[in-house]
Amino acid sequence: MIFIWFWRECDCLFGANNVIFIGRGHLSSKLVEEGALKMMEVSYIPCLAYPGGELKHGPIALIEEGTPVIAIAPSDSKLNLMESSIRECKARGAKIILITDHEGPITRFADVVIQTMKTHSELSPFVNIIPLQLL
């Protein structure tokens, strides 16, 4: 049942020319690299993984109307900075798939919110990798 929900909600991934993954902080940055690699291996869609802070240094130019952006935003000290990165992507017409354990204002910028359970920030990659694998 959860697979059907993922496929229906994340339909912007079908036919995408590229997919951009963003995360802030050491753990989230490494996690988006793994997610991008898995998606490229399975779907043969070009995927790019970037730390959210480096978005303005090139990757933002690749975002056009309908480009899927998968963002990981755990509840940690980087959450407000991640919200800023998501807002920039949304302003350029990206379809935002947000993976977060936060229920606050950051979710209003997402087209799809995949809610994960709250956990210690150092353990969040173990929880957040599951939705990335299901995508």
Please provide the spans of the model-predicted regions.
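A SIS-like phosphosugar-recognition module
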Residues: M1-L134
